């Protein structure tokens, strides 16, 4: 394990280099502009002052003794997690532009190198800022609402030109490489918050019959999500469309990213934090599953930006109830791999037929179908967390000290 002193040295070097680069680029750009002397000087000093303040705040993470319970200190941890994530990707972007301008090697080489480095460059932020957050709800909502989207979009910032290898465009624009970054960062944070690494194998207490039912449920649900083309109840079992969309590479990678990154966020991070929060509640498991599903549904509200309001509301309802099932499957099987696989297959089935994960405005029948599937999800999720299945879940939680 890398020592905190080494992490602090790493953070110091990154912060110093990024400050120098940002200031150098700022000065060069201002010199090029045709401002009056007074305006140019004023603008320069204001921007340099802002950058200096931001840099100084980032250096505060190097202080040896800080009271982690002080509100100002806690606020700084939130702020630095955000500002470091933003400034590092901006710095890499500017470096790539400069290297490209002077034709030093190829775009593909530098963007590939930047993508590789971005996999580890946020580690000091995770260790020195994000993992120091104390509030349980802060640990839940801050990564889910802000850090998730920031980190997933970070490598896409580098892909400012299409004059690079196709595989690099796919990895970065789909959010696949950003998803890997998020997994690494949250693994560090969760470790520092006292959580174990999630299991990949199925719990030895899980019934083979129940696992079989889960797998059957997954197959049927994915088939309906991707290939059922019915427009009325009379054709619900007879109308199927197995044609593939013309361009499916990026949607497939986007779906796989959703599978591993969103499940890492919602089931490994959020659900475990909720289980600890509700530990002394009478219905710990039920409250955790309900809260996890509701948060998962609410996170889809951001899709208002690229699709209709009715489509987003439909998606939020479906995601909320699907979240109950994802959580119940994870808790019963004790395997993050099953929930990841289900989520990835569910989205892939839709992506390869529609060519996108963006939804169109739903018809009256679409709403009826969504409500029916939501009810089925709720019933199945409750089945998995009740009766003898609940005993298995409680055993799994004891093994993970939850």
Language-model regions: role of each:
Residues 27-42, 97-118, 123-145, 154-264, ...:
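Juxtamembrane helix-loop-helix connectors linking adjacent transmembrane helices
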Residues 10-29, 47-55, 77-93, 117, ...:
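Alpha-helical transmembrane segments
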Residues 167-174, 280-292, 335, 361-369:
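Membrane-interface starts of transmembrane alpha-helices
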Residues 261-291, 328-335:
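Membrane-interface helix/loop boundary segments of multi-pass membrane proteins
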Residues 4-13, 25, 29-42, 58-64, ...:
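C-terminal membrane module of polytopic membrane proteins
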Residues 1-8, 63-79, 131-134, 198-202, ...:
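Membrane-interfacial, low-structure loops and terminal tails that flank and connect transmembrane helices
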Residues 301-317:
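Interfacial helix-loop-helix junctions of multi-pass membrane proteins
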């Amino acid at each position: 394990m890398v020592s905190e002193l080494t992490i602090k040295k790493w953070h110091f070097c990154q912060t110093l280099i990024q400050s120098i680069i940002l200031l150098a680029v700022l000065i060069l750009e201002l010199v090029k502009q045709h401002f009056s002397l007074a305006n140019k000087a004023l603008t320069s000093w204001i921007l340099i002052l802002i950058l200096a303040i931001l840099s100084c705040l980032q250096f505060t993470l190097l202080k040896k003794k800080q009271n982690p319970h002080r509100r100002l200190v806690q606020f700084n941890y939130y702020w630095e997690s955000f500002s470091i994530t933003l400034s590092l990707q901006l710095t890499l972007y500017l470096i790539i532009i400069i290297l490209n301008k002077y034709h030093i090697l190829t775009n593909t080489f530098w963007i590939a190198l930047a993508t590789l480095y971005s996999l580890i460059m946020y580690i000091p932020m995770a260790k020195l800022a994000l993992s120091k957050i104390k509030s349980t709800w802060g640990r839940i909502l801050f990564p889910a609402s802000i850090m998730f989207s920031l980190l997933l979009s970070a490598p896409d910032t580098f892909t400012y030109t299409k004059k690079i290898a196709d595989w690099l465009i796919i990895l970065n624009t789909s959010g696949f490489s950003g998803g890997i970054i998020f997994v690494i960062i949250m693994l560090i944070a969760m470790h520092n918050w006292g959580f174990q690494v999630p299991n990949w194998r199925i719990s030895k207490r899980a019934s083979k019959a129940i696992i079989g039912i889960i797998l059957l449920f997954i197959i049927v649900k994915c088939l309906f999500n991707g290939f059922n083309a019915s427009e009325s109840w009379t054709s619900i079992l007879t109308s199927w469309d197995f044609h593939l969309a013309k361009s499916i590479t990026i949607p497939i990678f986007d779906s796989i990213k959703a599978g591993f990154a969103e499940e890492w966020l919602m089931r490994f991070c959020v659900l475990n934090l909720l289980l600890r929060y509700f530990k002394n509640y009478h219905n710990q498991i039920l409250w955790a599953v309900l809260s996890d599903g509701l948060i998962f549904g609410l996170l889809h509200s951001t899709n208002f930006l690229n699709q209709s309001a009715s489509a987003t509301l439909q998606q939020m309802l479906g995601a909320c109830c699907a979240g109950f099932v994802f959580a119940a499957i994870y808790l019963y099987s004790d395997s993050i791999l099953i929930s990841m696989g289900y989520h990835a297959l569910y989205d892939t089935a839709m992506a390869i037929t529609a060519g996108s994960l963006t939804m169109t405005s739903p018809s009256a029948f679409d709403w009826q179908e969504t409500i029916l599937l939501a009810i089925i999800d709720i019933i199945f999720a409750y089945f998995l967390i009740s009766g003898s299945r609940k005993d298995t879940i409680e055993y799994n939680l004891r093994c993970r000290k939850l």
